[in-house]
């Protein structure tokens, strides 16, 4: 409770009584006759007065002519506390159980330069269970340039007698001054006789209770308010049925327990504890210290409240509060005390990872955190103590900051038991990031508890969005179950959607506003009864080659993910890419499986006409492919194993349906994984997690036949980063941002890209007639964002090579959470039509060659005159998730690096008259080949498979890797072992079964095969189906090598010996090895 609030409530009550309104009655009256009437009688202030409005605290309220509509508004000035502002009473005007729409217009008084121009709308109510603060709108940004419409909803609920009910407008900036106009509060579909109200709601008692579903994993908890714990309240009934752990939503926060110094009030907190004991539940205590919902007196000098308390006084007050609170529950409840842990400190980290600049930090210093833990441990040594925070599940800068903080606290002996991950996520949150965050934080040796779980719908509560939410909840709880060794509790922040703290419209929990089970409930409680959402993915137009080498064109395709478990929670998953032409649907299934078995395999389900029938029709197909390559024989397939699992390439005939652009094909993918038991232990799917694919196509996902991959070109060159369009940029073709993520018009850009050995350069010329950077959020300012995926892995999460680089029109830089910004440079300039952003993004993770393709996208953010982002437009990705997901990036081809033979600074005595002299000298100068001694190259000496492999690695600038022992004839310690490992992982060499034959002399056809794999990595080369060569000894070439040799000959990389023979089984010499490597450089324009 805020400082002076008790005094305010007394004044408020007296005010109402003076004005003759009857306040004290046992039940709220019904509505007036006009159900759609505005409940605010003077919301437009057109009377020229503020009649009907009262003060929260002691601000100055006055009618003014700075109107939104009409002639008058209300000016709010003279604020000195965050909670101060105008208030309006709704006592006697609102009906229990009814929902209301709330709308008002707000504009800042000019000239304030506030760093926190935010408005919060709150409803204060007092009933038999005490005082409550219900958020209607949380921290809406407003500006002085124009009026901002603030919208929210409110549902009235209370226990016993409603004594006080008023709405007030506040701000986290305690001195912010603002105007208010056009305040409208109207009922939503007013409750009529016969409609559902609390006493008519019946919960579903015949469905599985959640605490039993997860009894082998962790307690399932829920945040509660004591006003909803009466036995007749269906919220209490739902709580008792499904949950076995409670946390107080507000009743145990500092302002609730000690509103004034020394006066502790435990009535509401005790009601929750009593309920927990009566229903055999455990509890989490929340929270002993927070920067919010803590009375101002904590931080004030008792002799002069305008001055801050001293460090010693604030520490004394903190210790008194913590000790008194823990002693109360320990003493009153003894062995029955259900509280097993406390959030000692809550939200001490800012979003940028630094310690929050709270009054605790300002007055005490950073050691206030360890002091709080010290006091709590001293008060109750048996209690588990947690640090709790939000946005630490994204595996970004705040996750790392929490890791560093807890590591430091533990190293100093602070008695910290665990980390509370609030987990306020949304329907686009990334499971891989959550998994990485849990495992990172758990590696500190502490418990992990999910403490405030809900899933924001981002304003979309459509049926489609609810089904999408259900899938993510299932994936989330499968992850929690897989991480059960770390997770000791999962707590939802609210029992049902009607009591969520989030602004409406929203539906973030498992039970809806009528307390009925939603799709999300069934997805985690009994997936067989769920209705899966229909996911969609694009198949890009193209005809990849199916064979020993994975076609390079797959690099351009965004994957879908077969990662939803049907059985088990830890096992094989896969990325699946799709392409199409008029004959085939092509799939590349890359399975991650660390327990290889002959039982492992995939199943592909195809519904060619995508009519989603509940039984198979003649166009529907089911294919099975085992990890050893056996299986369905009526499709083209190729299966190879690798260090991560196995890869399946498929060509599925679709010529019979005459496919055309934008057609849809139904598809599902199922993975079967034997983890060593001799039977299938885990089953994973892309779409249908009810596992009905064998007989039912209605839950297959959709594959949309789409255009070829989006590829732009960056040419080699080095511009000056000065925010100007230098002449060098005129050589570059431009791309245009025309993929709308938010809005359909507004600021756009043309962009050009260049590269050199140190940087990727980007020039964006933005058209924007109204520049604004007033938002406190950089992403809402007029700005350009560049997204880079250096290895173009197109993962659903950010890897270490990925980056998000944001620059606004005033050259203010900001970056995504995991982006390495070291060395980043930018410059901007204003133009008649907008602004220019020029950037230099340092390379960190890849070998730079002509033909390299990286993942790339560019985004323009457009702010309106109020600082609100109204437009987002990209070059490629329409998802809006580029900040956390690289799979939708487009592709950028690096080209144009000049050719030119290096000075021949290295020579050997024995190559003076050799036909390959010039070639050997160039390669030796580049350290790609080496002599047998400093003076002898021995060009006629045969070359081994290991030696040629080492040369190719140097050509590609691939670093050696520690040998993992894949081959029986390669031993740790062999000079070539690490080179073999790196080349094997890169797909340059394959071996034959368990042998690599490293010391065998390499044949000419073997050398050509390896060389062409290297050429594919240097360029965008795609192997043609040529078949026979023109060599006289074509019949002597092995079948597996014939097409490779034919392609190499066509490109001029190899030549025959005299008499036009290739001599495929002939042993290659060191001179011939140098010649073919030189040919690779020459033909790829990398000399």
Swiss-Prot record:
EC class (word): hydrolase
All residue ranges annotated as the SLH domain in the record: 903-966, 967-1025, 1028-1087
Gene label: xynX
Keyword set, alphabetical order: Carbohydrate metabolism, Cellulose degradation, Glycosidase, Hydrolase, Polysaccharide degradation, Repeat, Signal
Catalytic activity: Hydrolysis of (1->4)-beta-D-glucosidic linkages in cellulose and cellotetraose, releasing cellobiose from the non-reducing ends of the chains
PANTHER family reported for this sequence: ENDO-1,4-BETA-XYLANASE A, GLYCOSYL HYDROLASE
Keyword Secreted: no
EC number: 3.2.1.91
Signal peptide location: 1-30
Active site feature: 347 (proton donor), 389, 452 (nucleophile)
Entries under InterPro entries matching the protein: Carb-bd_dom_fam9, CenC_carb-bd, Galactose-bd-like_sf, GH10, GH10_AS, GH10_dom, Glyco_hydro_5_CS, Glycoside_hydrolase_SF
Annotated ranges, domain GH10: 204-527
Name the record gives this protein: Exoglucanase XynX
Keyword Hydrolase applies: yes
